[in-house]
From Swiss-Prot:
The chain crosses the membrane at residues 119-141. Its EC number is 2.7.11.30. The keyword Coiled coil does not apply. Interacts with TSC22D1/TSC-22. It is found in: Cell membrane. Keywords: Angiogenesis, ATP-binding, Cell membrane, Disease variant, Disulfide bond, Glycoprotein, Kinase, Magnesium, Manganese, Membrane, Metal-binding, Nucleotide-binding, Phosphoprotein, Receptor, Serine/threonine-protein kinase, Signal, Transferase, Transmembrane, Transmembrane helix. GO terms for cellular component: BMP receptor complex; cell surface; plasma membrane. This is Activin receptor type-1-like. Residues 73-76 are annotated as: Mediates specificity for BMP ligand. Changing H66Y: In HHT2; loss of receptor activity in response to BMP9; retained in the endoplasmic reticulum. It catalyses: L-threonyl-[receptor-protein] + ATP = O-phospho-L-threonyl-[receptor-protein] + ADP + H(+); L-seryl-[receptor-protein] + ATP = O-phospho-L-seryl-[receptor-protein] + ADP + H(+). It comes from Homo sapiens (Human).
Length: 503
């Protein structure tokens, strides 16, 4: 497949930046007022250290111009325009208001000088013969290689799960790369050298999220949108762990966030840790539920797909193309993304634990970070969890999954009634609960989130309500397994009362 006009060599590293100012890291100099025209603008103007104009062209789309303020990465202002990105910076009030940018035109291929007719008559037959021989050898090699691949290919892998679908128009170069013969033996990503090449060709476009780990940016690679998670230096172990898991086990699954590349780069005299994944414009399930109310069939679609992802993590697959069992350890609505087809995929494996039955080896990693206190199971809060038992970690995932089901159910419309989004235990703990706050509510008072009575009026939500209760048993071993949750939800989705929503 091809992407746009032909290009020779690797595309140069692009950088672009449009922000509305950074309240966490204010600039040291005086601020200027700038025109703000971007999807993330909160008004017609913003204030920052300088004003920016960025012109971005995604593959198959018309160029879009964004205006805003900049506080970080001033070195990007010195970048040269390319056929995908051009950026401009200035330092006076509203200096970016009437600025218009253009992209560098794609250079046409230079014409080859004509050859002498007599030389062509002599070399023509010779070259044709050599070409036929080369094609024959190449064809034989290709047939043998394809036969070897078919013998070793894992039956559960499908081509569709390996293609990055960043836009609906045109072909995907990244999809070609992920679908080619150069992927790693695990099938989880690209070889390390290819990963570093891809990482250095990504242009950062806009910051779409911030958290305790760092930032998430939307980037462009050859005109395709990708997500770039930039870890803070104090969270290096999370970056290392997530990179390690993606590069050593088979995690290609529709309901697990697709991994592309990982790299440690130096930008502006500081080290940055990048994790590049597929980009999903709906964002996290947490964000999606705050914006969107759900019909019962959509609530079920989200729940089933999340359960499929968790079941795939928890199961061990044997064989040369297998994977160890994995427990997430930080399952929550912020770590579940909503794809364009309104199915969920699970993200953030920085705290994951791996286990293989053959060696009975429990790989906990070396990360001092702990999970999110609001979603911790009672055995974690009262420090009774068996840290040497892999099943214990899976049981904590199930407790958290029940809380995510509760979040989905609250936003589901039944008889015209729906509640505002609230996090679990919103009515009994503060916004940022401490370990002791959660321990008192969950372990001492033995409280669980209140399940609204209205759920009993709908056959889908009544099943979800019962499932929540079975995820919240105080005895961890009595809780449902991820596989049982998946099968039960699929059975509900195929029941006569509701249409089939999971393909």
């Amino acid at each position: 497949m091809t992407l746009g006009s032909p290009r020779k060599g690797l595309l140069m590293l692009l950088m672009a930046l449009v922000t509305q100012g950074d309240p966490v890291k204010p600039s040291r100099g005086p601020l200027v007022t700038c025109t703000c025209e971007s999807p993330h603008c909160k008004g017609p103007t913003c204030r920052g250290a300088w004003c920016t104009v960025v012109l971005v062209r995604e593959e198959g789309r018309h160029p879009q111009e964004h205006r805003g303020c900049g506080n970080l990465h001033r070195e990007l202002c010195r970048g040269r325009p390319t056929e995908f990105v051009n950026h401009y910076c200035c330092d006076s009030h509203l200096c970016n208001h009437n600025v218009s940018l253009v992209l560098e035109a794609t250079q046409p291929p230079s014409e080859q000088p004509g050859t002498d007719g007599q030389l062509a008559l002599i070399l023509g037959p010779v070259l044709a013969l050599l070409a036929l021989v080369a094609l024959g050898v190449l064809g034989l090699w290709h047939v043998r290689r394809r036969q070897e691949k078919q013998r070793g290919l894992h039956s559960e892998l499908g081509e569709s799960s390996l293609i990055l679908k960043a836009s609906e128009q045109g072909d995907s170069m990244l999809g070609d790369l992920l679908d080619s013969d150069c992927t790693t033996g695990s099938g989880s990503g690209l070889p390390f050298l290819v990963q570093r090449t891809v990482a250095r060709q990504v242009a950062l476009v806009e910051c779409v999220g911030k958290g305790r780990y760092g930032e998430v940016w939307r980037g462009l690679w050859h005109g395709e949108s990708v997500a770039v998670k930039i870890f803070s230096s104090r969270d290096e172990q999370s970056w290392f762990r997530e990179t390690e898991i993606y590069n050593t086990v088979l995690l290609r699954h529709d309901n697990i966030l697709g991994f592309i590349a990982s790299d440690m780069t130096s930008r502006n005299s500081s080290t940055q840790l990048w994790l590049i994944t597929h980009y999903h414009e709906h964002g996290s399930l947490y964000d999606f539920l705050q914006r969107q109310t759900l019909e019962p069939h959509l609530a079920l679609r989200l729940a089933v797909s999340a359960a499929c992802g968790l079941a795939h993590l928890h199961v061990e697959i044997f064989g040369t193309q297998g994977k160890p069992a994995i427990a997430h350890r930080d399952f929550k609505s912020r770590n579940v993304l909503v794809k364009s087809n309104l199915q969920c995929c699970i993200a953030d494996l920085g705290l994951a634990v791996m286990h293989s039955q053959g060696s009975d080896y429990l790989d906990i990693g070396n990360n001092p970070r702990v999970g999110t206190k609001r979603y911790m199971a009672p055995e974690v809060l009262d420090e009774q969890i068996r840290t040497d038992c892999f099943e214990s970690y899976k049981w904590t995932d199930i407790w958290a999954f029940g809380l995510v089901l509760w979040e989905i159910a609250r936003r589901t419309i039944v008889n015209g009634i729906v509640e505002d989004y609230r996090p679990p235990f919103y009515d009994v703990v503060p916004n940022d609960p401490s370990f002791e706050d959660m321990k008192k509510v969950v372990c001492v008072d033995q409280q669980t989130p209140t399940i609204p009575n209205r759920l009993a009026a709908d056959p889908v939500l009544s099943g979800l309500a019962q499932m929540m209760r079975e995820c919240w048993y105080p005895n961890p071993s009595a809780r449902l397994t991820a596989l049982r949750i998946k099968k039960t939800l699929q059975k509900i989705s195929n029941s006569p009362e509701k249409p089939k929503v999971i393909q």
